[in-house]
Curated annotation (Swiss-Prot):
Function: Binds to the 23S rRNA.
Alphabetized InterPro entries for the sequence: Ribosomal_uL15, Ribosomal_uL15/eL18, Ribosomal_uL15/eL18_sf, Ribosomal_uL15_bac-type, Ribosomal_uL15_CS
PANTHER family named among the record's database cross-references: 50S RIBOSOMAL PROTEIN L15, LARGE RIBOSOMAL SUBUNIT PROTEIN UL15M
Organism superkingdom: Bacteria
Protein name: Large ribosomal subunit protein uL15
Source species taxonomy: Bacteria, Pseudomonadati, Pseudomonadota, Gammaproteobacteria, Thiotrichales
Organism: Francisella tularensis subsp. mediasiatica (strain FSC147)
Gene this chain is encoded by: rplO
GO cellular component terms listed in the entry, alphabetical order: cytosolic large ribosomal subunit
A GO MF term: rRNA binding
Region (Disordered): 1-52
Keyword terms, alphabetized: Ribonucleoprotein, Ribosomal protein, RNA-binding, rRNA-binding
Single GO biological process annotation from the record: translation
Gene3D superfamilies assigned to the protein according to its UniProt record, in alphabetical order: 3.100.10.10
Biased composition (Gly residues): 21-31
Length: 143
């Protein structure tokens, strides 16, 4: 087998439709577009969501909700992620240094997901009630 001898299987490829090439082709004269009207013209079609002048669905329905801008600067850390930290004292900066949170994060909350094996000291970081109990049980403290 050589690359220059490769060919598709017989009957697997069909020739493209050749429009406007005479009556005998089956797609002559109007090229399958019918007679007149917007869709028969070149460039003639409506934009997505256009309903012929009727008020479109996305404008008939009420607006709802919004995304809080401050939410972008809040992150959650799971308990088991604190096991991987080399530092004993955990602050916002240490979490950023170890790549656990993005650089633009301003507040962090530790949630009780997974287990913590080592004693860590949280400074300036919020945590849930369950996470606080788990950290103190492991010998750490929350400040």
């Amino acid at each position: 087998m050589k690359l220059n001898t490769l060919a598709p299987a017989a009957g697997s490829k069909s020739a493209p439709k050749r429009l406007g090439r005479g009556i005998g082709s089956g797609l002559g004269k109007t090229s399958g577009k019918g007679h007149k009207g917007q869709k028969a013209r070149s460039g003639g079609y409506h934009k997505v969501g256009f309903e012929g002048g009727q008020m479109p669905l996305q404008r008939r329905l009420p607006k709802f909700g919004f995304t809080s801008a401050s939410k972008r600067h809040v992150a959650e850390i799971r308990l088991h992620e604190l096991n991987n930290l080399v530092a004993d004292e955990v602050t916002l900066d240490t979490l950023k240094d170890f790549g656990l949170i993005r650089k633009d994060i301003k507040t962090v909350k530790v949630i009780a997901s997974g287990e913590i094996q080592k004693a860590v000291s949280l400074k300036g970081i919020a945590c849930t009630k369950g996470a606080k109990e788990a950290i103190e049980k492991a010998g750490g403290k929350v400040e």
